[in-house]
């Protein structure tokens, strides 16, 4: 069944074409599958694999057994090896015996048509519109691939600061953080592992008090985030003043 599964999934665009282009001996890989290893996982692990990581049809129904998932990931990590089949078998044995468990993005995407394998990304937003727009775009693409993102917003000028090019005042970083939050919601991958983000600001920023309220349930919804988390860079000066009980 495994060779048929791979070829059908490639034809339907669910798997990368390299999975069935001849570099793998699919019959040999199928012979290595050991359904008894399903019992090594606890019930919660099996359900989590089904709900978050298993390949699905367009109607949302899973089409992979746990061992199919392990082998699909193993193949997706072995495209460029000297002997892809042997490498995939070695990866499979380690994963199916729970000796090695790859990160979530690798489990979701390896072997698939959108093979983004990294879990974590860092972005730093500069104080200009091009950088802000690029951060929103990058957030959407990374979230599509289930990546987690840390985004630094400290460089953005505070609300009320002059904007020379338009002869107006800046709205500050908070509304742009809301744009990141909305982008995460728009690319939420309902039913599977979703992307995530944490927005970072250093404690000396003039809008720091507004920033720490971002996750509050009450208040102006345009100044709140529901999906993006918040994190703070604490300076040495801040901690020195805490020790001395100073403002």
Identify the function of each model-found stretch:
Residues 1-247:
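Extended catalytic cores of very large enzyme megasubunits
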């Amino acid at each position: 069944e495994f060779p048929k599964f791979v070829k059908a999934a490639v034809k339907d665009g669910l798997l990368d074409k390299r999975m069935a282009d001849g570099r793998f001996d699919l019959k040999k890989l199928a012979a290595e599958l050991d359904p008894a290893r399903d019992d090594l996982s606890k019930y919660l692990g099996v359900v989590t694999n089904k709900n978050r990581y298993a390949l699905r049809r367009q109607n949302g129904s899973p089409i992979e057994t746990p061992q199919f998932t392990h082998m699909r990931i193993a193949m997706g990590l072995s495209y460029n090896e000297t002997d892809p089949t042997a490498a995939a078998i070695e990866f499979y044995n380690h994963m199916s015996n729970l000796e090695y468990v790859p990160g979530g993005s690798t489990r979701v995407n390896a072997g698939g048509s959108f093979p983004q394998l990294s879990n974590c990304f860092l972005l730093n937003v500069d104080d200009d519109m091009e950088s802000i727009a690029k951060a929103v775009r990058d957030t959407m693409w990374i979230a599509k691939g289930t990546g987690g993102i840390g985004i630094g917003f400290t460089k953005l000028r505070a609300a009320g600061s002059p904007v020379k090019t338009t002869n107006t005042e800046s709205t500050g970083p908070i509304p742009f953080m809301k744009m990141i939050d909305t982008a995460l919601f728009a690319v939420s991958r309902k039913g599977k592992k979703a992307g995530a983000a944490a927005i970072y600001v250093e404690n000396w920023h003039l809008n720091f008090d507004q920033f720490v309220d971002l996750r509050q349930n009450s208040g102006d919804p345009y100044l709140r985030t529901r999906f993006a988390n918040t994190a703070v860079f604490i300076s040495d000066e801040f901690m020195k003043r805490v020790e001395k009980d100073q403002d």
